[in-house]
């Protein structure tokens, strides 16, 4: 996951007279043409700013992501002890017993606060996943989570009740500075993964461990080498990575965590652990995969190995990546993709990429990360990565219903393409203080913001400059006070759907254009969008006569005209 901070924009429904809401007609007249105001494309304008170079046998100077930590320059050469790789018969797995409580999926449609279209043939084994890595830091900061009954309870119980069957947890090698201060973002070390993983296992959910093989965020813009591995050559680093994987995974399994999938690397399009040449990255991947295989054998369970990439919308990216993995003999079971609809193109393209991997290489595919906002508001005063109309995808509003629709539709597209399932990214990352409060001391102390100032010693170019609070709270599936949203129930409602009283979701603004000097024809109807999209309809509209008369099509400009919907069946606020 990468972060982009943007100023939030909040749109409000306009009202006319006696509290009645209206639809609005937005127009602009410029460069000789009367046209609708720009609504944005639903894509992130910064998504390509980190560069598009493919990992491969190119010069390291040509690669865009940060790989070696800046502060490491000029350090003396360190002598590293030789690491002997443990085989399965040298690994001791004696899992702690955890009493497990499970929750069944419904056997028919449910009544809910949202409408969910059923996916008739979806399997109960379809991965309904949630990345919940920041939970412990959020809780340590004083925030609380609640169940659907409004009572405080373990967030993992709430997730399981909502149909989540898989939890994804990131692991950083050493996310602390020399004084033990956490870098933030959840301070996700192995001990944190163990504590959260045990709680997930307690409620019957499988666990995916996401090794970043870095001390902090690893994504296409940066893949910093862990501090302890600085100065290592490739062979030493491969051995260290193997040992870290074996030791960490063994500790997690022995704690009783039901690990069933392991990611070796996170969004590694541009490199991993400071390596950028694909031949070198492949050696690290093979070391990580081999470590998982040996631990899996020692544990007597089938732990799947996943490799994780993003930017699947870029032409040729997936084909080049998978060809390189095959060329260098990387052993893996699952091709994991990040798919954020506001950054990574259409669902149809996502399906095509998945089917290409399946058909060409016989690998399974999972969506390792996705999300969508339920509001454009900011919950903690620190700004959000996704906010405003320009970040939204056509047809999916920033509402609880819009979030539910997006998750349901991504799951439907994934199921149609024989994808294993979907992990929602950080749906539990909520604010730890109100937006109008100074929460910085809490973020610094407990690591509940995306980065703390202490991370600057490790990542001075990004986190060290732009540290702060949670940039994802408006995409969580809990509100700003920790109460679950109805959209969280989509996981349990995928197969049979959910019904809700028919309600208007929005009345979108209408946009028209005409040439300068031409006659302007205003539309006679406006669309009314419902929570059940099959009920959407066109309704007659009367535009404000005074505002309409003020339009001069002989002069370039922009105009906004309010209109009244003519339908007695609509609630008064929408007429």
Regions from the PLM with identified roles:
Residues 1-76, 130:
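Gram-positive cell-envelope targeting signals
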Residues 532-574:
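Serine/threonine-rich, repeat-prone extracellular segments and beta-strand-based repeat modules
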Residues 182-183, 187-192, 218-325, 330, ...:
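Active-site cleft segment of glycoside hydrolase catalytic domains centered on the general acid/base Glu
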Residues 154-156, 298-304, 319-391, 408-419:
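Glycoside hydrolase catalytic-domain groove-lining segments
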Residues 151-218, 278-303, 351-354, 358-360:
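Aromatic-lined substrate-binding rim segments of carbohydrate-active enzymes
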Residues 501-534:
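Solvent-exposed, low-complexity, repeat-rich "mucin-like" stalks and linkers
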